[in-house]
Amino acid sequence: QPYSYRDPHTVGAPEAFFTRIPRSHVYGWTGIQVMNFNSLFQLDTLRRNHDSALAAADKLLFMPDALSYMLTGQMVTEYTIASTAQLVNANTCRLEDALLQEIGLTQAHFGRFVYPGEKIGGLTEEVQRITGLGAVPVIAVAGHVAAVPAMDRNFAYLSSGTWSLMGVETDAPVITAETESLNFTNEGGVEGTIRLLKNICGMWLLERCRTEWGEIPYSELIVEAGTCEPFRSLINPDDALFTNPANMEQAIKTYCSDYRQPIPMTHGQIVRCIFESLALRYRQVLDSLRNLSPRPVEALHVIG
């Protein structure tokens, strides 16, 4: 039975892991933003809970690698998704043995390590028969990379969805005391690049509210929000309160009450609070990126 990545079974998992290996060591190796649901902490949680599936596992495949396996019969571990999992050393671009050892795994539990652009194999005979295709080669793609069209390299991107990913592309990891303090991530990219970015809670806030409200059309909510007083109430979208609350509208109201702000009462006020809070958070992260990036940030590309 699979877990949702927002399942509370990993609450406190990073802190439990850091009692054995200091956070500074883990970040120094991986450069990855510490989040409860990183695969490193999920696997460690399974290990601590004596999970029978993990104990019996011969190979571990990330979702993109599982799809490649279904197509080719070849078990591989693709670099970018393994990097995001917080299992890769950002400087060697290989799985970090010290982390694997701590969660009771070895290199043998993972498939052949591949990078974007490498050939994984060809379609299996069964897939060829089902699809009518021939022995088409299957090439490894970046299993966890947001793409953005750009004419030059002096840009930042904002991939806006359930999560908002804001970052820049760099030629090498940026792993410093400041990036660790700000909890920025250095995810492996294509052609030797690194994506220095921050994961921000995005439209999850609005999606959950809409679910509670009966899927009111976005257009109606936006019009109503436009009639409301600006900057009346603001939240920190990344507060743990909003990770997976039983009721998102109530969580927003609770936050505003706790911080002695006017409590948003109407749908429009709540939507305006969400949008303005996200916009301010984006501005805050963009300012940090300008200071951290080795190149000037001259444009922001927003995709979704």
Predicted regions located by residue number:
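A charged helix-plus-loop insertion that forms the helical arch/lid used to bind
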Residues: 2-9, 83-87
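Short, glycine/charge-rich flexible loops or terminal/linker lids adjacent to PRPP-binding catalytic cores
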Residues: 7, 121-126
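Active-site core segments that coordinate phosphate-bearing ligands/cofactors
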Residues: 11, 18-31, 35-36, 41-75, ...
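Helix-loop-beta segment of a Rossmann-like dinucleotide-binding subdomain
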Residues: 77-83
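Short beta-strand to alpha-helix junction loop
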Residues: 91, 116-123
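A conserved helix-loop-beta module that forms one wall/lid of the active-site cleft
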Residues: 97-116
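Short linear loop/turn motifs
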Residues: 111-119, 222-226
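Glycine-rich Rossmann NAD(P)(H)-binding loop
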Residues: 303
